[in-house]
Amino acid sequence: MERFVLCIHWERRAEQQQPVPQGLVYAQDIYTQLKEYSTNCTSTFPACSLTGNPGIRKWFFALQSLYGFSQFCSSDWEDLCPAVTTDDSEEPVQTALDECLDALQFPDGEDDNSRDSISQTNLFEEAAELLHQLSDKLPAPGRALVDVLLFPSEAPKLKDCLSAIGAIKHLKEWHTAKITIVSKDCKGWQKIGKFLSANVVVSDCPRQLIDPQELWRGTIEIKERKFTSEVEFPEFCLRSVSDDKVPYFENNGDDKNKTVLSEVFHYYGASLEYVQMVALSEIPSYFVSDSVFELSITRNGLQGKSKLMLDQLCSLTEKVGAIFMLPCNVCSLPNPPALQRSSKKWREYMSRKPKDIKVPGVELKGEYCSYYFLIQGKGSGLCKATLLHSASQISGAASLLLLHQRLNNNHPVNMAESTSDILDSLPHFNGEQIALREQILARAQVLAVKEYLKRQEAQPHASVSQSNNLGRLLALTREHVIGDCESRLDSVSYKNMQNITVSTPAFPESEAMISNPADWPERNVLQNLENFEKIKQRLRASILSGSAEQLLGRKDGLKEGMTLLDAKELLKYFTPQGLAVGELQPLQVQRGDNAFLVTPKLTPRKLKGLPFEKAAECHYHGLEYCLDNRKALDRDVAFSELQSRLIRYETQTTCTRECCPIPFALSPIPSPAVLSEPGSVPDGESIQTELRGDPLRLKRRSKDIEGLYPSKRLAKSGSSDSLVSLASEGSGHQQPTRLRTERTASSVSGAQPSSTRVRTAPSVPAQSKPSSHLELEQKESRSQKHNRMLKEVVSKTLQKHSIGVEHPCYAACNQRLFEISKFFLKDLKTSRGLLDEMKKAASNNAKQVIQWELDKLKKN
């Protein structure tokens, strides 16, 4: 990771003007030190991908100074890497320190009166703006280690420097900067240091404030999958050690190998994720690399859970270790600075006054890789982190390493020595061993023959080729016993082979069952590769289902695997009407290897009698769901209501009367997304159809409509069929009556008559209306209106194609074209441009329908 160092100097101008302020002297020493580091301390983590090697570590410097009423800030981060100059005539570039001294000693045309008129608050606000501009020029997260060194002469008032402290807080929270305050007045800076999580020190040697060996800073994260909880331990760092060896796959002496892979950009994760505890005897030697790092906390005086976590890791012995994973993104091109963590987003976020400051996530382009570290105690309060090769890195490298070692160790020898070596490598027998082997072979063949005869007696109708089978059995038994004896020559002496008993006849096929599969290196490689693919699938699924996780919470890791069907394969199981073809069989879903362990001797009856504390410790099916204080049930109910509202208001089409069935009684208030589109408010006829089947819901609905939303909704839905026709806004007792009216044939031709319910207008005094009788305002519903419009469009389209009412095919063409056009219009969600869509659908299908009906008429 690249190192970015920001020095901040705040000091009042003294009466006796100093040539160089003390804070700038410290900054100058640090600048000189960083120049040395940019040449010597450029090492970083090894490559974790075949895409390329990480580039050398660069060092950057910036300065912000507030001296009296004069102020200076670097416009950009200065690269301290030694530049290669080709032309001697070029003038050296002025450094940030030189620019700062010039700006403070020779201010730009400001007199004393203008300086005195500037308040301290304005100066700190200007400094905060300049610091925000520097933070916006930092690279994407995971590539930079930021150190902020503050050199104040005395503690200013908090209300004056609050804006500048907020800019430093932005660097701390969203750019994981390490803050160090160097001041003689430690008590005055304790409050600000606690707010910034900074380390307040009194140091006359600023060179000790920057640790050049730090390669990564972040948190240690431990996740618990069962209850989807996680714990973070901040302020950890990985440091390089001086005795670090170069891994075997890196050859610094060969310059040709360095140019094989190009330099790429590595973006490291913000946390070390805990994987598992492991015994060192279980890790194959070729997975362990020679790269060793050091794990420690960044602040020596830090107390709390991070110090306790470090003590626990230091207690790991030489036989046990903890494996942690550091995610990394590898990209051939640099990612731009993250706009999600810019100063503008920071101001917007802090204006909402959050209780806890959360870091916004950033999506980085590139290949997803990971580093694996084996953490063990090192002593003196530190841990060593040994780099482990992942499955993708070790694939083929172990066998290649073994081959190279044997080739390097293979020295040419003369013919006599090679012949003696070959003879020595052959197995050596003596008379006792051969006799003992023949005795074991005889016992094995006797047992095999007995077992063979026993099976033949159980099968009376045996085949004719019994002698051939018996000969093959004896040959296989001899081959197996001799091979077994030769394999035991190196490990077991033949004197101990007398204790070996052969109980059943063995065959060569069973040899694979005797050896331990856990010893195969290929098995470990395949298992690691399979786990790596599972992790990639989980990450991909979590990115695609982000909105669902916000509604339903995080899913269990075992339930994330889904069995997907192709669209064509899925449609085979359903009819065109949407019904199942037959009884569908449940799909076999692969579960994890971890079986659910039920508490022994636990029944539902015993579980009901247990108190809450003991029941929470038990393991039973559905127990976590029942003991969550109804949070899961409330979440399911809330999501079902949301889903029903979306289905009810968003999925309803324009030419259908039937509503989708909903599981809950809905609020009469439509969702805000619906009000943004005219014509998407539900019509009165659909609400009528919904309420007709349930009288209780009708009473509740009418009460809600009259009480909660009296007239505003009906005024907005001008294109829909209202349940209540408002006659006036005057006061009076309303007596709604229900009437049944027959739908006239002129409204919809060819449609069957159906009864509708309307509510009459309320009675009003005689002064407001001359007549006191009830007026029925029967209106046409939206679906009826759309059907009538479509029939008119279809009729006009047929007339354009010379198919009039008197034509014999008119009725059939009219009905068929109406149904086809209605099918094309059913997916429309609004009424905008509906008439044009009707004309388009009818004209596109008119010729085909007319030709079909004419051919049908000719055949008849």
UniProtKB/Swiss-Prot annotation:
Keywords: Cell cycle, Growth arrest, Ubl conjugation pathway
Key word Amino-acid biosynthesis present: no
Biased composition (Low complexity): 717-731
SS bond list: none
Biased composition (Basic and acidic residues): 772-788
UniProt xrefs under InterPro entries: MTBP, MTBP_C, MTBP_central, MTBP_N
An individual GO BP term: regulation of protein ubiquitination
Region feature Disordered, mapped onto this chain: 671-788
Record field: compositional bias (Polar residues): 732-758
Keyword Manganese: no
Superkingdom of the source species: Eukaryota
GO cellular component, one term: kinetochore
Annotated function: May play a role in mdm2-dependent p53/TP53 homeostasis in unstressed cells. Inhibits autoubiquitination of mdm2, thereby enhancing mdm2 stability. This promotes mdm2-mediated ubiquitination of p53/TP53 and its subsequent degradation.
PANTHER family in alphabetical order: MDM2-BINDING PROTEIN
Family of this protein: Belongs to the MTBP family.
Name of the protein described by the UniProt record: Mdm2-binding protein
Species for this entry: Xenopus laevis (African clawed frog)
